[in-house]
């Protein structure tokens, strides 16, 4: 069901309850959370915290549209890669307690720069194939984010989806991240076109520039072709959360997120 949502990220001065109340006050009706919001990996409570968080958001009229897994499938040691896959399985199980079936996922981060770039694809492909085996069991779907440097290419994302071959693997379409990576706007529009049928979740984000020249702004104030992204995704039948992500200078008090909500309310 379509909703205007927001990510629990870049809300300085708000704890989780404060975020929930402020976001609801602005008008948001769904949110994406981080795995740490609902689960303490070192003290696994079998989903009890996740259920409490779900009740918190229910109480302010919001649902949880997705949870970010915080996974990293680019690992120098095989044992660490296997541990990440095992952890991902548990994350999928825990996330179901929030009421969503969307696991917003990264590819990998190559922390420490220990893995050659030529090995990244194989590691991520094998990992997502392994994960595909238990998605049906937990009735969840993977929304692969175009995030960082390992997954920020729409042609590659589509290739991964096709090679994994699971209808439960799609994308979290971040409208800005491709530009941050360095793609030009025409190429980004191409990514919107080819990935639209595979969109499970969104990050509606705007800004200008790439890498060290990147500046985040409220929706509608940057250079991203947001209306074209909406057109492509809607045409493909997407009916999920339109989730605002704001990285501009007006984070205090949720001011930037107020502006994003106003744009989304007028355009989606």
Where are these regions (language model features)?
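Active-site beta-loop-alpha junctions enriched in small/polar residues
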Residues: 7-11, 34-36, 69-72, 108-110, ...
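Acidic/histidine-rich catalytic cores of soluble enzymes
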Residues: 3, 22, 30-31, 67, ...
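Conserved, mostly hydrophobic/aromatic
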Residues: 23, 31, 57, 95, ...
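C-terminal helical cap(s) of enzyme catalytic domains, especially alpha/beta-barrels
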Residues: 253-268
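Catalytic domains of carbohydrate-active enzymes, especially glycoside hydrolases
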Residues: 19-36, 99
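A structural motif
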Residues: 28, 95, 100, 199, ...
């Amino acid at each position: 069901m379509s909703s205007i949502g927001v990510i629990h990220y870049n809300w300085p001065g708000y704890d989780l309850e404060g975020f929930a109340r402020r976001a609801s006050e602005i008008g948001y009706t769904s949110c994406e959370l981080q795995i740490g919001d609902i689960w303490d990996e070192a003290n696994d409570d079998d989903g009890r915290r996740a259920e409490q968080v779900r009740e918190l958001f229910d109480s302010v009229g919001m649902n949880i549209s997705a949870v970010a897994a915080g996974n990293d499938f680019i690992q120098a040691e095989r044992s660490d890669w296997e541990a990440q896959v095992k952890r991902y399985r548990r994350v999928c199980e825990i996330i179901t307690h929030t009421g969503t079936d969307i696991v917003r996922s990264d590819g990998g981060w190559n922390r420490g720069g220990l893995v050659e770039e030529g090995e990244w694809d194989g590691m991520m492909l094998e990992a997502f194939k392994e994960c595909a085996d238990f998605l049906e069991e937990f009735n969840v779907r993977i929304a692969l984010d175009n995030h960082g440097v390992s997954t920020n290419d729409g042609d590659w994302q589509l290739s991964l989806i096709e090679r994994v071959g699971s209808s439960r693997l799609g994308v979290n379409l971040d409208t800005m991240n491709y530009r941050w990576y360095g793609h030009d706007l025409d190429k980004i529009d191409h990514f919107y076109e080819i990935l639209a049928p595979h969109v499970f979740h969104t990050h509606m984000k705007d800004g200008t520039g790439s890498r060290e020249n990147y500046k985040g702004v409220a929706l509608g104030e940057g250079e991203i072709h947001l209306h074209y992204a909406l057109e492509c995704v809607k045409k493909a039948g997407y009916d999920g959360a339109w989730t605002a992500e704001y990285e501009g200078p007006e984070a205090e008090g949720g001011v930037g997120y107020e502006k994003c909500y106003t744009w989304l309310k007028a355009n989606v």
